[in-house]
Amino acid sequence: MALMTLSVAKEKRPLVALLGLMVASLATLPLLPPIAQDPSYHQFADQRTLLGIPNFWNVVSNLPFVLVGTVGLWQFGRDRARFVLFLGVFMTGFGSAYYHWNPNNGTLFWDRLPMALTFMAILTVAVEERVSAKAGAILLWPLLALAVFSLLLWRWTDDLRLYGWVQFFPCIALPLLFVAFPARYSGTSYWLIAAALYALAKLFEFYDHAIYSVGHILSGHTLKHFAAASACFAILRYFQTRRPVSRSPSLACDSH
């Protein structure tokens, strides 16, 4: 019995460390200078109007989010965390299209809100997949509330520090989760593909104008949408194809 208790305590240590990192990183935010929204953020490279749609490519390139979100909701909508995840992806398509139709801080709120919910849902789902469904269920609602509050705080104070945490903390936490906890399901490669595609999306976003200047065909921001939606598709494929990973008898005994 003592050995089993010690084993369970050992398994919980990485999760406790992750929660500690979460609290510590949040506690450091007030020590950082406020981050205001850059007014030039809305000046995207490709502002062409086509078929009566302003900023055409930045608007219509959100369609893949809607498609991935629709399939995800259809197949996995009965699971709470995955429902939030794919609803967030689905609504990101509409929120981002709404924003790019008329880019300003007011419409940007509706672009960022579903994205913030998606970031926190991805973190929750990863905890469910690598740690336990119970741990994920405990984290889901507090993290979603934090996501919503981060956007409200930005609107009230023009301070993006907390929203920045919501967006980038999963980038730190997910690798730690995947290293600290063994896979309970197959398909880890899909998570790696999703991470690579998201990194590519951020790169496209940064080089928006530079990419558009080469031929004036598509801008970096449009390509960012395609890459980010592809990352969401990789996560969808993970859930479509994953299978439980068999564990050795000794490990199975240790986990009970």
What is the meaning of each model-derived region?
Residues 62-70, 144, 167-174:
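Core segments of transmembrane alpha-helices
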